[in-house]
């Protein structure tokens, strides 16, 4: 009986140990599965996060490149406008300087009025500051034309240059520094654009 009890105790121990080992193996197996699931979920989350980060980085790069391109375009347009403005101002200054020479201006007026039909009534409008000196030169050079209906008048709206008006029609021909410079600039502008074209 003593052996039976001992065998029974050993059997209970053995069964308990086997059950404990089986339970322990089940727990370990379950823990491994859970760990594998956690790792798989973590890897999936990391993959999704990496893909999202790469997309955001790529989007940021694309936006940054587009912003850079726009900034470069704006800079080029700004430089072109500034160069165009400098060119236009230099052109106006040069035309004004040329038209400041009263002898040249008088010759120009004479050549232009010579091409008009005889007997046409013309009014030559000169800027006020140059009127007296130009009037003397023109009276000497035009002589009889002034008696035949050509008239010289001071005009406030002209800085340099002159305007010619046909009396009967009311038509004006503008030879002021501003108008000549504008016409030259419009003529030269396409060529100027080709010279400064960067892109």
UniProtKB/Swiss-Prot annotation:
The keyword RNA-binding does not apply. One of its GO terms (molecular function) is proton-transporting ATP synthase activity, rotational mechanism. The keyword Metal-binding does not apply. One of its GO terms (biological process) is proton motive force-driven plasma membrane ATP synthesis. InterPro entries: ATPase_V1_Esu. It comes from the Bacteria. Transmembrane segments: none annotated. Keywords: ATP synthesis, Hydrogen ion transport, Ion transport, Transport. GO terms for cellular component: proton-transporting two-sector ATPase complex, catalytic domain. Produces ATP from ADP in the presence of a proton gradient across the membrane. Belongs to the V-ATPase E subunit family. This is V-type ATP synthase subunit E. It comes from Borreliella burgdorferi (strain ATCC 35210 / DSM 4680 / CIP 102532 / B31). The lineage of its organism: Bacteria, Pseudomonadati, Spirochaetota, Spirochaetia, Spirochaetales.
């Amino acid at each position: 009986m003593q052996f039976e009890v001992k065998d029974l105790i050993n059997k209970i121990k053995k069964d308990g140990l086997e059950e404990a080992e089986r339970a322990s193996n089940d727990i370990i197996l379950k823990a491994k599965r859970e760990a594998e699931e956690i790792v798989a979920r973590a890897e999936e989350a990391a993959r999704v996060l990496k893909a999202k980060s790469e997309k955001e980085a790529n989007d940021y790069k694309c936006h940054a490149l587009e912003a850079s391109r726009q900034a470069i375009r704006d800079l080029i347009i700004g430089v072109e406008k500034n160069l165009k403005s400098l060119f236009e101002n230099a052109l106006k200054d040069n035309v004004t300087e040329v038209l400041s020479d009263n002898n040249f201006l008088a010759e120009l007026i004479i050549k232009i009025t010579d091409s008009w039909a005889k007997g046409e009534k013309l009014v030559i409008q000169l800027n006020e500051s140059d009127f007296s000196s130009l009037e003397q030169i023109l009276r000497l050079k035009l002589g009889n034309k002034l008696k035949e209906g050509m008239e010289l008048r001071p005009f406030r709206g002209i800085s340099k240059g002159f305007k010619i008006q046909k009396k009967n029609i009311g038509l004006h021909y503008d030879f002021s520094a501003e108008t000549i410079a504008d016409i030259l600039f419009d003529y030269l502008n396409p060529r100027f654009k080709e010279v400064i074209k960067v892109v």
